């Protein structure tokens, strides 16, 4: 008698209630309105079958413009099924799924919650995995989350057609090499000049990855080619990317290089922001939070040195990044960013102190275009009874051409394991000296976990906005002034 298949069903519910007052950013189109956001995510499995669905909705009251739209929809749905095939495992996927080729230069459809980005491919994928060979093919249309969390405006689905595939040969001796090849073809729904016919682009790439058996070294190299046909004109583009990691006892060395020759993948227009969707997210060489305005025509490198002391509890490090945007052109921009710091873990790993500081310069035509000096700190220290103090701070001294300003934020809080935290956040931004624009921001934050299945987080006050970047994805966030309550519930239904 066959064994019963294990079946599960899980629900995750997120409800956000907001009231926006006057954030004093010099605009009136984002003030004095309320908002309720809801997201229900269901995930289930039964034997080799896995399913998921996401239901989203937004409800506004006193909306200042028609751009804030009430809506409700089935945002995501996916079905996966595993089966044995020819000595390997075949996974069949239909519906919505994220997909990346290589390190994201050729294609990167992914979710970046911190900047409100979520694009999937709505279609199908066949993926076969054997002992030393992985192969997959996929096709579908791009499906963007229909609510832009930054502007809080509706997003029209781009429905750009994408098809591609990849193959990876693994465990090639003696360095446990992996050789990968991949490619994709994209046809955007919107052409730049429809009279010249359908825009389209194709890209091919290859990668080689390996590591020494001793663990002393590991590397990754990727080369890509792209052909674009836009408004009747054909363009060829190329890209190279590589990393080398060395573990020399207590010393660790990371080396990274990037060359992009007019390399990008753009689809139809994002109706919420007015620019095209980016379907590729190449590495940037930058620290994850750094502003990256252009990452399509650039070359550069980065090196990071770290040294483990006190049995690895104290790790000082130094990082140097140099890149050129638009090399050899009149608009060439030379960028250099040097920073260093230390990460210290003590009290048996229960406490930590991280400090860093650095400087950045961007020079164009012999003149400093942008400059920044920055410092960051994060301290967590237990104080007994399951309580801990947590303080984090960032500060930036900036100059944009002849304009000097500063911005930063600090958060100080008391945390209780298994219960929650209470914090105060203070931010500042002097980039706009206008009297009607707020420069000091103060907010109180309360997080509470009444049960293992429920988490509440409330924010009251004002919070700094501005340009925020995560791994090269950048958005300009509006300042916030008002109140916000987030309730998250989770539980197993089966």
What residue spans do the PLM features occupy?
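Outer-membrane beta-barrel "beta-signal"
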Residues: 280-281, 448, 462, 477-494
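Conserved C-terminal beta-signal and adjacent last beta-strands/turns
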Residues: 409-427, 439-461, 485-488
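Cleavable N-terminal export/targeting peptides
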Residues: 1-6, 492-494
